[in-house]
Amino acid sequence: YAEEALQHALTAGAVAAAVQIVARYRCELTNEEQWQRLDRWVRLFPPEVSGREPELLLAEVWFMINRQHLAGIPPLLDRVEAVLAQGAIEAATARRLLGEVEIRRATLYFYAGDHVRSLTAAAAALEKVPVEWWLLRAQARLFLSAGYQAQGDLERAYATLYAVDEPAQGLAAQMRLLVDACFIHWMAGDLGGVIQAATQILTHSDELGSQVETITWARYHLAACHFARNELAEAERLLALNIRQRYQSHMQCYVNGAAALALTYEVQGQTDKAREVVAQMVAYTLEIGGAVGHAAAKAFEAELSLRQGRLAEAVNWAEQSDVPLTIPRPLFYRPPVTLAKILLAQNTPASRQQAGQVLAQFHHYAASIHHTSVVIEVLATEALLYSLEDRQEAALTALEQALALAEAGRFIRVFVDLGEPLARLLAKLGHAWGNSPFIARILAAFPQTVPPADARRLANTALLSPLSARELDVLALLSQHYTDNEIAAKLVITADTVHSHVQHIAQKLGVRGRRTIVQTAKDQGLLE
């Protein structure tokens, strides 16, 4: 009905009435995440009208935010502020529109790395935007929370989203705040928090109706965690759903999700599928336009080229690209790390020096804004650099720091994807850490890039007291449910000796009972 009324008004030349129709429904459509529908409405107006009306301009800005056409946004916001400064718009409406302008400026400040101004603008927006415009308020709270997180005040960051002291606006509003929380948990390296929030959203997906953006963000966040923990089947399932809804998704949600899906295929040996996803990503970002999405797609194209052994293609991107190192990278894919890995793959003194400079600058920035998930990846990559330079002590120190940050969230793939050199470092570090289930779990994931026998050997060396060859033989037969007498016959030893070996295995693994021994050995990569 509303769209029909809008078209009738425009056909009749009643432009002011048409603008009022958009204004009347914009709150509802905004809360329902109907940014594409609003954009269609705006395009029905002549450019001279859409270019001067704040309601239409801000609808266009929202569309541009979701498509990541960021460069064109500031002039539109300036135009809105100029109209509001004339004082012709009713005071309450003008205040709400100004609050929306401040939300969009908070967004731009965040992407530019200016967290202080982003936080300030978001706080000002919350003072102006009415509670019934709850999606706008949720967006303001995201950047307010991110500002606190960048200052290291994680408690206040979470309180901004989880302890909202204002009238409840329903399930969809609550779920949108959980989407915001996913971003903060991810940046803080708290995969468990992301999983809890995203799972809660998806539990209510049938009730959320038109909230496609909320659902796609939740799927993306959950899948990113599954990939990080090497739970590839579930990551693939969620991401495959998302890329089918790319036209309804935020550009960053699509690009980062497609990157994660391509890697999920790649690490499972499905290289053709990985290339198909990346080709689609590059084509889509060209179709939609906007430098931000396309730059990320091309960077990830180079990442995949590197992983698939096409170093010349990857180097070509690295030599032609200017990758900013001091802007936030709050999502799955981080182009600065790709740049560093390409330089490391070239493995010349000059390229290693340049890689070190990239990693050091990116590390310093990420640490300064408390983006723990980024710091984990950078530290692991720095460990690889130091290993290439035969600086073993520095390599082990960097890796130990990465593991200390990664263990609570159970990050796995960030280490595995750096290959066998990191597996060797992990095995060495295992001796210093003692009987570390976390290191063993990471080493157990290496068979995708390391032969299974080598992976089991590395997992064993990570134990404080590695199992002897005979103990490994006994363990293998235990896993096949052999009795002591059967093991004794198989290995040509006495049953008492078998019993002694089992006790020693249990002591070294820190567990009791045969079933627990076998399960722990599997978890730690000692058994297939």
Where are these regions (language model features)?
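Extended alpha-helical scaffolding segments used for macromolecular assembly and cargo binding
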Residues: Y1-R67, G72-L76, Q354
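Amphipathic alpha-helical segments of tetratricopeptide repeats
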Residues: L6, R26-C27, D39-P47, D78-E90, ...
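Regulatory hinge/linker segments at domain boundaries
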Residues: A444-A476
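Recognition helix of helix-turn-helix DNA-binding domains
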Residues: D473, H481-T516, T520
